[in-house]
Amino acid sequence: AAISNATSTTSQQSTPMKDTEEANQGMAYLETVRSRTVTIYLPLLIFVFVLLFPFYWMVITSFKPNEELLSRDGNPFWIIQPTLSHFHKLIFETAYPEWLWNTVIVSTVATVVSLACSVLAAYAIERLRFKGSRQVGLGIFLAYLVPPSILFIPLAAIVFKLGLFDTRWALILTYPTFLIPFCTWLLMGYFRSIPYELEECALIDGATRFEILVKIILPLSVPGLISAGIFAFTLSWNEFIYALTFV
C-alpha cells in the first residue's frame, strides 16, 4: 500500500512538471514562429513584392487604354476597361514580328558560334599547356573587360567594307567579339575542375585530343556549357548599340 501511495504521489507530481514543460515548449515554439515571421518571412515577402511589382505594373499597363493611362482620376494599380488594342497595333501595325525573329536568329547563331570557338580556346589554354597559355588566358579575360563602345568604330568600318550593313551577318559576326572572351573565360574555370587523370587514361588507351574533348570533356562540362550558353544568349538578346547601328 505504501508503495502504491508513493507511486501515485510521484505520478501526481510528474504530471504538473510535464504540463509545465509542454507549456514552455509551446511558448518557445510560438516565440520561434514570431521570430521567424519577423526575421525571415516578412523581409522575404517585401523582397518578393519589390521583385514582382514591376512585372505586375507592366502587365496592367499593357491592357489599359490610352485614356486610362493618361488619366489622373483613375486607379493606377488596377484596370477599369481592359483592351487589346496595344497588342493589335504592335503585332499588325508594326514590324515587331520581323524584329523579334531577327533577334532570335542572331542571338541563337551568335551563341552557337561563340560556344564552339570558346570550347576549343578554353580546352587549348587549360589542357595543352603550351608556353604562355596563362598569359593568353589573362589576355582573353582583359579582352572581355573592353567595353563594346570602344570597338564600335573599328567594327563599323569593317562591316562597311565587307558590305554587311543592314544584314543579320553584321551582328552575327560582331557579337562574338564580346561573347567569345566571356565564354572562354567561363569555360576555362570549368575545364580546370575536371580531373586531368581522366585524359591521361584516355591518352594511354590511344585516344586523340579531339576524341578526349568530344567523349570526355564535353559530357562532363554540360552544366558549364549551359551556363555559358545562357549568358551568351542573354548578352546577345540585350545588346543594343550594334543592333541599332548595323541593322
What are these regions (language model features)?
Residues 30-31, 36-247:
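A structural signal for multi-pass alpha-helical bundles of membrane permease subunits
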Residues 1-45:
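Transmembrane alpha-helical segments of polytopic membrane transport and secretion proteins
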